[in-house]
């Protein structure tokens, strides 16, 4: 079941990430599939009929649709449990329900079984105050990395319920990059454009794999907790990332993770720019591109929440923030709703657009996935 759960969120990771990519754009991209799937689980738990089927199909869920929400919530819970004090990952789910809106006991009980708090709110009379309160909760649960999540007016007197997931991750490298080795260096945004960046350097015994088909190098950078690691996917050519992105699939990413993690450690010189990326998206169009349409329409069947058919999802927002430096990685997200031995060290230079993953080594789920097109942007 654990492998199935990871496959579901990983499918979402690839599909949603791909929907964020604008061909040819020099844009950094980051999202948290684990946060998105957790928020979707809160909706799926109350969905029925076509609405639920669309969510299940988008996630390639082939089991009983009623078990989807439980699987997604269980995966997030397991990922958070497999982290020690040296690498805290914290995930929290909260549902706020308007005072005059009654949810079904069965929905409330399911949420509580996964430690999802259900609170009251007065959206009808004090939507502005409730927006401030909910934004404050998100800020607190992301170590203040995400502020003012819901913009003014997003929640109104018509709001019946707000479903939110917050995810925070801060990992220290198992072997930190030496601060004194960081240098000003050139990052090739394209064949015709270069920018200056702070390039970190690190030489260590690491797991490395070269994908000859995709023409890229992969290296795993473990965090001190060992339960999580970052994986870099660096193309051989300056403009090679577009080809990698166009063929991105669940089987390919799963193969990358398997090949890298089964490789024998070898000496690898890693050059990695410091970077910080923040991205906020209205997920409606992205989710619709994955085939999730019904829950946003007047035909939505969310009768598992309140027993009625007059509910639909009015907004779906996701924000992710990630910062990588010599010490490690700090990231936050919120969602509303086989190698040959070589005598010389291998060298992985992330001095051109590349992809990164932060993965759970226990559940194999993807916490964050991103693209760095220009670290100086």
Swiss-Prot record:
Site (Reactive bond for chymotrypsin): residue numbering on this chain: 342-343
Highest taxon, organism lineage: Eukaryota
A GO CC term assigned to this protein in UniProt: extracellular space
Keywords on record: Glycoprotein, Protease inhibitor, Serine protease inhibitor, Signal
Signal sequence interval, chain numbering: 1-27
PROSITE patterns named in the record: SERPIN (PS00284)
Region annotated RCL, chain positions: 328-349
Family recorded in the similarity comment: Belongs to the serpin family.
Task performed by this protein: Inhibitor of serine proteases. Inhibits chymotrypsin, cathepsin G and human neutrophil elastase.
Protein's recorded name: Serine protease inhibitor
Organism from which the protein derives: Cyanea capillata (Lion's mane jellyfish)
């Amino acid at each position: 079941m654990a492998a199935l759960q990871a496959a579901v969120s990983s499918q979402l990771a690839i599909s949603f990430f791909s929907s964020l990519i604008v061909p040819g754009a020099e844009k950094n991209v980051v999202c948290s599939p684990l946060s998105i799937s957790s928020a979707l689980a809160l909706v799926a738990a109350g969905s029925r009929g076509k609405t639920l089927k669309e969510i299940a199909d988008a996630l390639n869920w082939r089991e009983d649709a009623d078990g989807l929400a439980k699987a997604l919530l269980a995966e997030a819970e397991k990922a958070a449990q497999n982290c020690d004090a040296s690498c805290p990952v914290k995930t929290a789910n909260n549902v706020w329900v308007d005072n005059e809106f009654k949810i079904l006991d069965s929905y409330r009980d399911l949420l509580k079984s996964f430690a999802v708090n259900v609170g009251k709110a007065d959206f009808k009379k004090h939507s502005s105050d409730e927006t401030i309160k909910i934004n404050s909760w998100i800020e607190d649960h992301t170590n203040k990395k995400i502020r003012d999540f819901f913009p003014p007016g997003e929640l109104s007197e018509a709001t019946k319920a707000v479903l939110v997931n917050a995810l925070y991750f801060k990992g220290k490298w198992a072997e930190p990059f030496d601060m004194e080795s960081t240098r000003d260096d050139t990052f090739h945004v394209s064949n015709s454009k270069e920018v200056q960046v702070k390039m970190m350097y690190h030489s260590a015994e690491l797991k490395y794999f070269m994908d000859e088909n995709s023409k890229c190098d992969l290296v795993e950078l473990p965090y001190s907790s060992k339960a999580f690691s970052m994986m870099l996917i660096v193309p051989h050519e300056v403009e090679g990332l577009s080809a990698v992105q166009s063929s991105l699939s669940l089987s390919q990413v799963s193969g990358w993770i398997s090949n890298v993690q089964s490789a024998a450690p070898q000496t690898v010189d890693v050059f990695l720019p410091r970077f910080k990326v923040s991205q906020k998206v209205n997920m409606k169009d992205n989710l619709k591109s994955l085939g999730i349409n019904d829950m946003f329409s007047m035909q939505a069947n969310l009768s598992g929440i309140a027993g009625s058919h007059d509910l639909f999802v009015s907004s779906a927002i996701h924000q992710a923030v990630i910062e990588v430096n010599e010490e490690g990685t700090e990231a936050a997200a919120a969602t509303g709703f086989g190698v040959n031995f070589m005598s010389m060290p291998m060298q992985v230079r992330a001095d051109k657009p590349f992809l990164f993953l932060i993965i759970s080594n226990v559940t194999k789920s993807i916490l964050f996935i991103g693209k760095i097109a220009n670290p100086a942007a």
